[in-house]
């Protein structure tokens, strides 16, 4: 590498929203804020969140189900 053309590669602390602090190195040279990390991400923790899709589908059908129906003769 050429001398004096590369940014300084410093040690920084990356802090997650859950409070986990990860020590890493970066050219950013400022503390980093993370949204998720391996301590709180559902993929790594095994805690999956399920959405209440059934209630939404029923609500949609009750509101708009009659628009697509054909009239019986």
Swiss-Prot record:
InterPro entries reported for this sequence: Ribosomal_bL28/bL31-like_sf (IPR034704), Ribosomal_bL31 (IPR002150), Ribosomal_bL31_A (IPR027491), Ribosomal_bL31_sf (IPR042105)
Pfam families: Ribosomal_L31
Cofactor: Zn(2+)
Gene Ontology CC annotations of this record: ribonucleoprotein complex; ribosome
Binding residues annotated for Zn(2+), in chain numbering: 16, 18, 37, 40
Keyword tags: Metal-binding, Ribonucleoprotein, Ribosomal protein, RNA-binding, rRNA-binding, Zinc
GO biological process, one term: translation
A GO MF term: rRNA binding
Cofactor note: Binds 1 zinc ion per subunit.
Signal peptide: none
Calcium recorded as keyword: no
Family as reported in the entry's similarity comment: Belongs to the bacterial ribosomal protein bL31 family. Type A subfamily.
Quaternary structure note: Part of the 50S ribosomal subunit.
Annotated function: Binds the 23S rRNA.
Protein's name in the database: Large ribosomal subunit protein bL31
Source organism (scientific name): Pseudomonas savastanoi pv. phaseolicola (strain 1448A / Race 6)
């Amino acid at each position: 590498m050429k001398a004096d053309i590369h940014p300084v590669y410093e040690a920084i602390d990356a802090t997650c929203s859950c409070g986990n602090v990860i020590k890493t190195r970066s050219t950013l040279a400022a503390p980093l804020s993370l949204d998720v990390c391996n301590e709180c991400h559902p993929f790594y923790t095994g805690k999956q969140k399920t959405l209440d899709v059934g209630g939404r589908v029923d609500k949609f059908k009750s509101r708009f189900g009659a628009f697509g129906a054909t009239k019986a003769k």
